[in-house]
């Protein structure tokens, strides 16, 4: 039976100011817009919260409990006591959902989540790769200064549901591969405390992927010894670096449990070595017979390391790197900081040479270069850094993971929703169509 949902209007009052212990809800009722979805798809849970006197509980922060565990971002109730929570559901089978404010808990609703098949183009000559962070945990990268709030909330990279949901999103967009960022692990002996957390998150990712019928392949990007490399005068390798490379090879790449998950190129596993930022001049010469090695810099439009075969983390103007007269690698991004090495990094995003998202214009224009170059490896910058100085605000950012569109009065910035998810899915599909049409 449907209940009539009454509302109140409080002119000129921010309803977030009303969220006090005395006004916490005593009753929460929910309903869902769907009872059956495919894995990774969204439902909307509509909730209404009332105080003990029966009036709407305005400004109360609600969050979901799915199969007994917290899931997703918090949503505030409106002056009517209503909130609409958008929830992706990654786990197959029956998902039992309740909503709580930490005091009262709603009735439950059940949504059945079914398997899906994704039409991912498998073209080893034109791979599309998302730059991906798995660093969100208690001792590595924390939350609190993100430029926008992910739909999944302030999640942990150690939560298998998060890893699975990200993988399902990558599948839906059409990605072949994710690039895992291991560039910050060697400021002390390997494995450092943060390195151990990175290992735990990577263990989980490989385990989750191994259990999925469709998933992206994996590619590592590592950094230099002591997290320091400026030019050929600095040593890139050392005992910590070598220990980490051995660990990656033995634990993941050469592990029979994870057969066929890792990317190979020119007959060997591909390993990316980050040059610790934008640099000029040639890269170091690192030799390891186990790997095909490529180096990654940034801002090639100014540094021009592509002439030495260096790939890019991102560019203001996408600049392809060639190998044997063919475009080998290119990176496109939806936003970029300025390329001024004379300034502190926290000023890069507010420099007049920086480029914001601009409602997708930056991203779409960079994709045009990819359409023309058609590289062997097309990198997309990026999914989810969410920390300063790498991101500045909602526009001056290059994160793409779906984020909340917040209501007026919510102190959290209103993000970009699924805009860059949708653009990416459409551009990848168009990219493969164009390649196929010219064969």
Regions found by a protein language model. Give the residues of each.
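Short, solvent-exposed loop/linker segments at the N-terminal edge
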Residues: 35-41
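Beta-strand-rich structural segments
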Residues: 41-53
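Exposed beta-strand face motif in extracellular beta-rich ectodomains
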Residues: 43, 93-97
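Short, ordered, surface-exposed loop/turn motifs in non-cytosolic proteins
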Residues: 55-64
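Glycine-centered loop-to-beta-strand initiation motif
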Residues: 77-85
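Surface-exposed, short loops/turns at beta-strand junctions within beta-sandwich domains
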Residues: 87-93
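Edge beta-strands of extracellular beta-sandwich domains
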Residues: 104-115
């Amino acid at each position: 039976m449907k209940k009539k949902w009454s509302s109140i209007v409080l002119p000129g009052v921010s309803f977030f100011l009303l969220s006090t212990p005395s006004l916490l809800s005593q009753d929460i009722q929910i309903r869902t817009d769907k009872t059956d979805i495919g894995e990774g798809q969204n439902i909307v849970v509509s909730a209404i919260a009332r105080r003990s006197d029966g009036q709407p509980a305005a400004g109360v922060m609600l969050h979901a409990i799915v199969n007994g565990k917290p899931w997703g971002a918090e949503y505030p109730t409106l002056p009517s006591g209503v909130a609409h929570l958008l929830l992706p559901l990654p786990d197959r089978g029956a998902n039992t959902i309740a909503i709580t404010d930490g005091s009262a808990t709603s009735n439950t609703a059940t949504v059945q989540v079914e398997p899906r098949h994704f039409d991912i183009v498998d073209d080893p000559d034109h791979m599309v790769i998302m730059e991906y962070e798995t660093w969100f945990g208690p001792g590595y990268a924390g939350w609190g200064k993100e430029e926008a709030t992910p739909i999944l909330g302030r999640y942990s990279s150690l939560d298998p549901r998060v890893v699975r949901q990200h993988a399902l999103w990558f599948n839906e967009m059409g990605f072949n591969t994710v690039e895992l960022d291991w560039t910050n692990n060697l400021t002390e002996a390997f494995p450092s405390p943060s390195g151990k957390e990175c290992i735990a998150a990577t263990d989980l990712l490989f385990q989750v992927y191994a259990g999925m019928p469709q998933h992206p392949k994996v590619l590592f990007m590592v950094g230099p010894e002591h997290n320091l490399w400026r030019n050929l005068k600095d040593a890139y390798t050392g005992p910590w670096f070598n220990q980490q490379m051995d660990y990656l090879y033995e634990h993941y790449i050469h592990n029979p449990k994870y057969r066929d998950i890792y990317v190979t190129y020119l007959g060997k596993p591909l390993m990316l070595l980050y040059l610790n930022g934008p640099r000029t001049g040639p890269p170091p010469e690192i030799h390891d017979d186990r790997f095909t090695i490529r180096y990654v810099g940034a801002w090639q439009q100014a540094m021009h390391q592509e002439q030495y075969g260096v790939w890019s983390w991102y560019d203001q103007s996408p600049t392809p790197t060639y190998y044997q007269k063919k475009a080998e690698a290119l990176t496109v991004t939806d936003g970029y900081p300025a390329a001024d090495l004379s300034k502190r990094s926290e000023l890069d995003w507010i420099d007049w040479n920086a480029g914001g998202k601009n409602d997708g214009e930056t991203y779409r224009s960079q994709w045009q270069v990819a359409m023309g170059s058609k590289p062997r490896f097309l990198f997309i910058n990026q999914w989810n850094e969410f920390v300063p100085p790498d991101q500045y605000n909602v526009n001056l950012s290059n994160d793409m993971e779906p984020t909340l569109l917040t209501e007026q009065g919510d102190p959290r910035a209103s993000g970009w929703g699924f805009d860059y998810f949708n653009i990416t899915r459409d551009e990848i599909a168009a990219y493969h169509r164009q390649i196929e049409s010219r064969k």
